[in-house]
Amino acid sequence: MTVGTLVASVLPATVFEDLAYAELYSDPPGLTPLPEEAPLIARSVAKRRNEFITVRHCARIALDQLGVPPAPILKGDKGEPCWPDGMVGSLTHCAGYRGAVVGRRDAVRSVGIDAEPHDVLPNGVLDAISLPAERADMPRTMPAALHWDRILFCAKEATYKAWFPLTKRWLGFEDAHITFETDSTGWTGRFVSRILIDGSTLSGPPLTTLRGRWSVERGLVLTAIVL
């Protein structure tokens, strides 16, 4: 079992003492869900069960780093993960990757992470998930070797995951305009999600601009927003 560090490249160093992460690149044999979690996957196919179990295993590894004992990670009304008291976090999984980032609520408002295969989006998906301005800008700001459409999709997903716990409201793909910067390596960078709808939150300041990082490595795109 290999616990990797890919997601560390997209996390801010300034709050690392209040953040923890864990990631795996395969599903270790023998893992089982906690009893409270088992009903959530009772009718799931094997692939879905493995994703569910492994990503929650990652979450418990990360929580343990912050001194939180093992706890079930259930789902809210919209499918969002429900974290132990005093904690926030985000889960993601795709082919060849499962990852979790957690943080202490008194230091971190919200976390959104996403992982995707670094490959072109299926036909028709780009128009559905992007704004015309994004489709015009990204080819000019990304190196030709990068699948910028997938990076954009990954950033949109991270934006939603950071948004929803604070608002409990839907955020459509068209409701955030994302711009990107590329670092000197060409394989990492930053992005800014400008929210185009009412950003009022359940408590605290509204969400108007969310800032994150992206990285392409080992055939994967990773994005993260930490608020």
From Swiss-Prot:
GO terms for cellular component: enterobactin synthetase complex; plasma membrane. Its cofactor is Mg(2+). The keyword Transferase applies. GO terms for molecular function: holo-[acyl-carrier-protein] synthase activity; magnesium ion binding. It comes from the Bacteria. It catalyses: apo-[ACP] + CoA = holo-[ACP] + adenosine 3',5'-bisphosphate + H(+). Inhibited by the amidino-urea compound 1-[(2,6-diethylphenyl)-3-N-ethylcarbamimodoyl]urea (compound 8918). It acts by binding to the phosphopantetheine pocket in the active site. Inhibition by compound 8918 kills M.tuberculosis. CoA binds at residues 48, 56, 75-78, 92-93, 114, 157, 161, 171. InterPro entries: 4-PPantetheinyl_Trfase_dom, 4-PPantetheinyl_Trfase_dom_sf, 4PPT_N, Enbac_synth_compD-like. Disulfide bonds: none annotated. Changing residue 116 to Q: 500-fold decrease in phosphopantetheinylation activity. Mg(2+) binds at residues 114-116. Keywords: Magnesium, Metal-binding, Transferase. Its EC number is 2.7.8.7. GO terms for biological process: enterobactin biosynthetic process; siderophore biosynthetic process; siderophore metabolic process. PANTHER family: ENTEROBACTIN SYNTHASE COMPONENT D. Transfers the 4'-phosphopantetheine moiety from coenzyme A to a Ser of acyl-carrier-protein. Involved in post-translational modification of various type-I polyketide synthases required for the formation of both mycolic acids and lipid virulence factors. Acts on Pks13, Mas, PpsA, PpsB, PpsC and PpsD. Also acts on AcpM, the meromycolate extension acyl carrier protein. In addition, is involved in the activation of the acyl carrier protein MbtL and the nonribosomal peptides synthases MbtB and MbtE, which are involved in the biosynthesis of the siderophore mycobactin. Belongs to the P-Pant transferase superfamily. Identified as a drug target. This is 4'-phosphopantetheinyl transferase PptT. It comes from Mycobacterium tuberculosis (strain ATCC 25618 / H37Rv). The lineage of its organism: Bacteria, Bacillati, Actinomycetota, Actinomycetes, Mycobacteriales. The gene is pptT.
